[in-house]
Design a protein with these regions (language model features):
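Adenylate-forming
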Residues: 4-9, 17-23, 30-198
């Protein structure tokens, strides 16, 4: 199957430099750091991505993969990304949040220039999203990756691009204003990059 081929011999750990040794068991402690881009910079990034037949998501993921390669010294970069899991018509009328996790594995070997890297990321992301019906939990069961209490299986880094409405959402007498996510001091992964797009 496509996922088994894509994730064959996936490295068990993306070792990032930290100021402390990895504990024997994950503690799930973490924090959020907020940064924002102005509208002009965002527009230039979208334009750059479009000029290379890519999306903003693909462009930012390629840049993130490159950063992870530089910090880890590895060419095989494995990142998770959440996706809305409502591909089946039967789920459309149900209330609730259905989320699946896709694994995006990018080969940065051969020192590709950024255009070539973006092309690789585009191909990987397009294929992964085309195969998003496979539940991540089932993939882990089938792949049987080496398990450890010290890390998440398959990937330890998450990437997410979230659409953030610029205007309040109105629902009758209730108004929802976009804002920052709450920092609960918890992290499921070693590193998560969430980009809010307005």
């Amino acid at each position: 199957d496509w996922w088994q081929e894509q994730l064959a011999d996936v490295p068990p750990l993306l070792e990032l430099p930290t100021d402390f040794a990895r504990p024997a068991e994950r503690r799930f402690r973490g924090a959020w750091i907020w940064r924002s881009l102005d509208g002009e910079a965002s527009a230039r990034l979208r334009q750059f991505a479009g000029s290379r037949q890519a999306t903003l998501y693909m462009l930012l993921l390629a840049a993130f993969d490159l950063l992870l390669q530089r910090y880890s010294g590895r060419d095989d970069i494995v990142v998770g990304t959440p996706v809305s899991a409502r591909p089946q018509v039967e789920f459309e009328g149900l209330v609730g949040l259905f989320v699946n996790t896709l694994v995006l594995r990018t080969d940065l070997g051969g020192a590709p220039d950024f255009d070539r890297l973006l092309s690789r990321v585009r191909a990987t992301a397009t294929a992964a999203f085309a195969h998003q019906d496979a539940a991540f939990e089932r993939l882990v069961e089938r792949l049987q990756p080496g398990r450890s209490l010290a890390r998440a299986p398959v990937f330890q880094v998450m990437f997410n691009l979230v659409p953030m409405p610029a205007e309040p959402l109105e629902a009758g007498a209730v108004s929802f204003r976009p804002g920052r996510l709450l920092d609960h001091g918890v992290s499921t992964f070693d590193l998560t990059l969430t980009v809010g797009e307005q």
